[in-house]
Amino acid sequence: MTTKKRPVGKKKFVSFSDDDALSRTGRLPKNLPQHGSPPVYVRRTWQTIPFHLIVLSYWFIKHSNGYDVRKCTWLLVPCQVLYLALQFNPATVYGNKILKLNYALLAVSGVTCILLTIPCMLLVVLFGAPFLEMLDKTWLLSLHCCVLSYPAVYSVLNSDFKVGFFKKYFISIAVGCWISCLAIPLDWDRPWQEWPIPLVVGAQLGAMFGYTFCSQL
Amino acid sequence: MRFKEVGLLFCQLLAVLIFAAGFFPQKKVLKGDAQFQYMAETQRALEPAFDKLVLVVIDALRADFLFQQNVSHFDFVHELLNRGEAWGFTAYSNPPTVTLPRLKGITTGSAPNFLDAILNVAEDDSSSNLKDQDSWISQFAKHGKKIHFFGDDTWLKLFPEEFFQKHDGTNSFFVSDFEEVDTNVTRHLPHELQHKDWDVLILHYLGLDHIGHKGGAASQFMPPKHREMDAVIRQIYDQVDNRTLLCVMGDHGMNDLGNHGGSSAGETSAGMVFISKMLSSYPRPAAQDGVSSPVTAAEDYQFFTRIQQVDFVPTIASLFNIPIPKNSLGVFVREFSSLLGQHATTKIIENYHQLMQLAAKKTAARGNDDIDSMLAEMKDVQATLARTATNYNYAMLFLGVGMLSIVTAATAYCYISSARLNEASVLMIAVTALLGSSVFGSSFVEEEHQIWWWIIIAVVGYSWATRPSCTPSHLVFLVCARLLRGWNNSGQKFMYDFTVAELLKSHPSIKWLLVCATLAVVALDGFTERPLLSIFNLLAGLLCFVYKTCWANVNGEVSPTYAQTLVTKACSLLFAGGTPWDDKQLLVPLARLFFKVTAAIVCMRIAYNVVFAKRKFLSELFPLFTIVLIMQTASQNIPLFLVFTIMRSSLRNILRVGYPQQRCEMFFVLSLILQNLSFFQFGGTNSIATIDLTNSYNGISENYNIYVVGLLMCIGNMAPAIYWSLAAVVDHQLYSKKSYAQQKLSSMFFYSVNSLLLLVACICMRYHLFIWSVFSPKLCYLLGWNILIHFLTETVLEPFLLMVAG
């Protein structure tokens, strides 16, 4: 019900969007920090829970043969696009509007994601990944992370680079990777301790947490 | 420092020391030599099964090197195994799997204690001597047998030279040599085999171990080395009669990286083969029956019959009819009972009596009992004895822990009540909690460097995200930290081939350029403000450089020509007299000159400060201290001090702009993190094996003082930690409003909580498999950190400097 009210109310207030006080008292959750004006935010709703990630992680941990990261990434791509189209985009509010899916931007943000793998890989190496060895695997990890952040990248592009609000989505993926590193030094010698499998799972869990709860923060 | 803090610190140190004294007791050993106990007269009259023994110890000979298809290239041994003239075993070698404790096990049959592993490092120590301990070597010697020994000089350290009629030791110090260590041994063989004027011939080959250390278990040098050893075995086999027993064994195994010391399957599974022409006329061991060698891969390197390495001792003693050494835990290897004929039962009962006496158990009169049940009982006793090889002094353990918990509670109270709630104190508490809990996991102790890295990236990431205005400094800091991480391998699990240190070793010209740059940058720091002091620093830096190149020349490393000209020029200037000096003779006077010059500069500066109080005293002395630390660092690690300089300036920048309110508190916490991280990335680990002794003898002549060497060793291994500790104090003096004692509470909190949890972990895990290979070394390192960094640097040196600074 609320979802329908907001677009209706928006039309009245759109000319006042410069007026912070009005738009804040009107529609925004009280304690939400403002990111640019008009504000961009993700509604607090169960709609953003990434169920596909739960299934995918389960499949990756239990049923993928030998933890095939490549295959997992291939599977992840359509899931993420669908997630963006059906769940994340409808929940994202741009200056009090909910925008329709922009198919051109979908492709552009896909390319952006692939380009982002290079700086992402650089960051992963800076944060301690092996250098010169296993670069292919590190690249695969950064590709996976970038695909995981695809909805957020799309939204950043869609909102004229208002990184401020979507920063936490990227951070939650990074924190997921970081926490999962704890599994690496253990001397259990399990196949899943191989680089970069723990980090892939960590990134998925981080993304899961991020897409579910970041709108609440 | 205030009285309260000093008191707490002393109590903390005392508690840890008390604990350590209870934890590392000298093992009780039975004195005296064994005599036959059971039917002594009959036994004395027995004929031994063999007349002569040839023992070939091949260092780090893992079981699969001897037996496994595609791995082993001991073709002749395989042939003998198939003919039944050789009996193969996999011998479990009790950790710590390093040579000295293992040799003790092989000769005396006793389980090693942890002190032996430490003494393995201390080359010149003589307290591990087995002169007064019963072993089959001493039994042979007492029975008038002639023993000849060639190989690793650890044997000569263990046994008095009069045991060996002839000996030639090779030093295992230069691990990079694969060939000469072994040809040095083999060259004696033709003479020995021709004259046969010995009863026992012991050969200890080191080459295989060296190959493992250098290139891992699958190194390309392994197959030729196997063939070389195989040829040695064939040579001996061909020239001895069938009254000679040839035994080939590894003292321990190795893991796939080629290291050893721990308790993994690879490290503890050593190969053992008994070879004699006579053996083919006896039934071969059941596990070897119908098996064709080389055999296929087995899980955990378990090939053929599995025995304990110490079982070698009673077996040899029985076969050669000598009394079983008193402290032996070994159980006679059942397969050999057929060689003893009708006396087998006698010998096993003898072994039973000896073992029960060691276990201080009453022995029921065993006469014609069933051999199998007796052997089974002996195995049980052996297992119990091996587990309780060390007797902990529980009173001292609990006194230490109790005292430390009181101290920790007091420190925690003082710290928490005085700390303001800010990022620095939260970080400190988080680090303390994390490190404290990590000591309960053996892999986290082994891979502690990963935890510190994990913490530092979290801190940088957090700080970057919350203070985006300092992005360039954060990036610089991160790049430097990553360089530091890539400089050396640490821990046990991951060994990367392309570390910066390895690259620099293979490109000496770049290395020496970087060393020059480092020394110049460090020495000329603050040149514009105090040119005179900088020139003095430069002088010290120059001396340091000359010494380092000179050292490289002596040790066969490559140094560039400009450095060599510099050395010649400097030396003709310094040590006038015109006669050309040998580089080797120069080392000691050069190092002494360096230390004298630095001491003089420090004294001058202190005297100057006593007259004209200058606030910048500490930051002005800092470069000179850094040069001293550089002096004690291996040359491939020296450029890291350049990295540190950059890191320090970017860190100061971040703290100045991003954390103006808690600048010094933050620096103290980060200093603690960086101390540990850089200690590990200099190549240190929590294992005894990586203690670096190369810089411990700088300026030390032959009749040296052990305490000076110890101090130099500590500084050499802890140089980066001292650097960061001093760096924090420099900033403290310049910018802090708090007193040093108050500031110090945070690291006291860390050390006391960390120590307490480690002591608790040691008590909980005292019967854990890894107690000697992981937890005990960690306890030693904790002592080292406590004494050197926490006490000497941060409680003696730094307050003194602060006092002079006024």
Curated annotation (Swiss-Prot), chain A:
Pathway: Glycolipid biosynthesis; glycosylphosphatidylinositol-anchor biosynthesis. It comes from the Eukaryota. One of its GO terms (biological process) is GPI anchor biosynthetic process. Keywords: Endoplasmic reticulum, GPI-anchor biosynthesis, Membrane, Transmembrane, Transmembrane helix. One of its GO terms (cellular component) is endoplasmic reticulum membrane. InterPro entries: GPI_biosynthesis_protein_Pig-F (IPR009580). It is found in: Endoplasmic reticulum membrane. It is a multi-pass membrane protein. The chain crosses the membrane at residues 45-61, 74-94, 111-131, 138-158, 169-189, 195-215. GO terms for molecular function: mannose-ethanolamine phosphotransferase activity. Belongs to the PIGF family. Acts in the GPI biosynthetic pathway between GlcNAc-PI synthesis and GPI transfer to protein. This is Glycosylphosphatidylinositol anchor biosynthesis protein 11.
Swiss-Prot record, chain B:
One of its GO terms (biological process) is GPI anchor biosynthetic process. It is found in: Endoplasmic reticulum membrane. One of its GO terms (molecular function) is CP2 mannose-ethanolamine phosphotransferase activity. Pathway: Glycolipid biosynthesis; glycosylphosphatidylinositol-anchor biosynthesis. Glycans are attached at N70, N184, N242, N488. The keyword Transmembrane applies. GO terms for cellular component: endoplasmic reticulum membrane; plasma membrane. The chain crosses the membrane at residues 396-416, 425-445, 451-471, 508-528, 532-552, 593-613, 624-644, 664-684, 706-726, 745-765, 782-804. Keywords: Endoplasmic reticulum, Glycoprotein, GPI-anchor biosynthesis, Membrane, Transferase, Transmembrane, Transmembrane helix. The keyword Iron does not apply. It holds the Pfam family PIGO_PIGG. It is a multi-pass membrane protein. Belongs to the PIGG/PIGN/PIGO family. PIGG subfamily. This is GPI ethanolamine phosphate transferase 2.
